[in-house]
């Protein structure tokens, strides 16, 4: 991203489902749990940065829209993934919150809608919440490992420059190609 100034979102149909339904999940949560919930924003803190889904005075929320009933129920029986846990920890660091909530919101997929299928779960029970507490030891490990990660990022960046030229050279070449 730093090199090409381009962010290539990994786009699977599951991620598209989540993006398409995030606003619905936000509105449902806001109306059911916390009228003061606000849309998230981008925040930088030193070398770290991220965009959260939603913020309240004392906590943040990350919305997940699973694409199957089993995937949704996993939030009850197995909790969140390690990746989701790390995401919550990073958001708590960035936004200085003691608590983050993962909100698993069940909504039909496009395939189901086209076939007029519906999950057998009442509309008012379609949220599963998993709470994550801030972990200061996690933050200490992150801070300790950051110099190594930045060093490796810079090596990667240099390899791209060696292979393709500097980013400014790429931009000039793109302009010439499009003219």
Q: Language-model features: where?
A:
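Accessory terminal regions of nucleic-acid processing enzymes
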Residues: 1-179
């Amino acid at each position: 991203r730093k090199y090409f100034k381009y962010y290539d979102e990994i786009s699977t149909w599951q991620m598209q489902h989540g993006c398409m339904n995030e606003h619905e999940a936000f509105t449902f949560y806001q109306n059911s749990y916390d009228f003061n919930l606000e849309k998230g924003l981008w925040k930088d803190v030193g070398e770290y940065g991220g965009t959260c889904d939603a913020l309240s005075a004392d906590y943040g929320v990350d919305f997940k829209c699973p694409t199957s009933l089993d995937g949704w129920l996993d939030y009850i029986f197995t909790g969140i993934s390690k990746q989701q846990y790390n995401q919550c920890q990073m958001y708590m660091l960035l936004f200085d919150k003691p608590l983050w909530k993962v909100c698993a919101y069940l909504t039909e997929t496009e395939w189901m809608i086209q076939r007029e299928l519906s999950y057998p779960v009442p509309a008012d029970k379609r949220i599963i919440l998993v709470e994550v507490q801030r972990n200061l030891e996690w933050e200490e490990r992150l801070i300790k490992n950051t110099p190594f990660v930045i060093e490796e990022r810079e090596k990667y960046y240099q390899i791209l420059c060696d292979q393709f030229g500097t980013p400014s050279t790429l931009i000039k070449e793109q302009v010439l190609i499009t003219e």
